[in-house]
Design a protein with these regions (language model features):
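N-acyltransferase acceptor-side catalytic subdomain
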Residues: 1-236
Length: 236
């Protein structure tokens, strides 16, 4: 049985070492999606992931997929795309539209874990300066992008979407370059996918990840508004 977290007592998570092996990383249920709960969770390497009709479920998988910003892998074809000038990359231009797009089912009739409760919670974190979006715009339309959380010198990627070829990859590459400029040391990708591996993601043990967060989030920078044109420098 996984522990039930009482939201009346404030955020108090069990150690991530107690997370289940099957399903990988399930740690606890209950709690709340308020800013204090989310900040406490992310600082400990924990994130919410659940479907409509389920209680809030908290996860911390082992191993953990991460990207170190200086290890971004840009393929020849992606670099060619990045050098074109048919798109515009914006930061925090329309966060709500990005999270809504990420919530759209990938297949007709499919579900989504980005429930209305999740959307409302992260829009609130965006208003507080913790959650950010990176957006690829083509011909005046939102073509792809991603959103995530920034705490200290760690960025936690949540979800991405693409309506045009390579639109999410364009946003991801510009995000990583922007994180390097801000001296971020780690981009958490949560779960392993081939898509992330192709961009330089690699797995590290959960205990190593949690220790790194202890260092990177100790320097808790004030939440910041990212400049909308902060990722628009030409790609070389």
């Amino acid at each position: 049985m996984i522990p039930w977290l009482d939201d009346a007592h404030g955020p108090a998570f069990p150690p991530t070492s107690r997370a289940a092996r099957h399903p990988n990383g399930l740690l606890a249920a209950g709690g709340a999606l308020t800013p204090d709960w989310l900040l406490a969770a992310y600082r400990r390497g924990i994130f919410p992931w659940f479907s409509d009709g389920e209680p809030i479920l908290w996860w911390s998988p082992d191993p953990r997929m991460v990207v170190f910003p200086d290890e971004l892998r840009v393929t020849r074809s992606l670099r060619k795309t990045l050098r074109k000038h048919h798109f515009e990359v914006r930061l925090d231009h329309d966060f709500a539209a990005v999270i809504r797009a990420c919530a759209e089912p990938r297949e007709p009739g499919g579900g989504t874990w980005i429930t209305p409760a999740i959307q409302a919670a992260y829009v609130r974190m965006h208003e507080l300066g913790y959650a950010h979006s990176v957006e690829t715009w083509i011909d005046g339309e939102l073509a792809g992008g991603l959103y995530g959380m920034a705490i200290g010198r760690a960025f936690y990627g949540e979800s991405m979407f693409s309506r045009r070829t390579d639109a999410s990859k364009i946003a991801f590459a510009h995000l990583v370059r922007f994180l390097l400029q801000l001296d971020f040391r780690l981009l958490d990708c949560q779960m392993t996918t081939r898509h992330l591996e192709s961009l330089g993601g690699r797995e590290i043990p959960r205990d190593v990840f949690v220790r790194m967060l202890g260092e990177l989030t100790r320097d808790d920078r004030p939440p910041a508004r990212w400049p909308q044109d902060g990722a628009q420098a030409p790609w070389t």
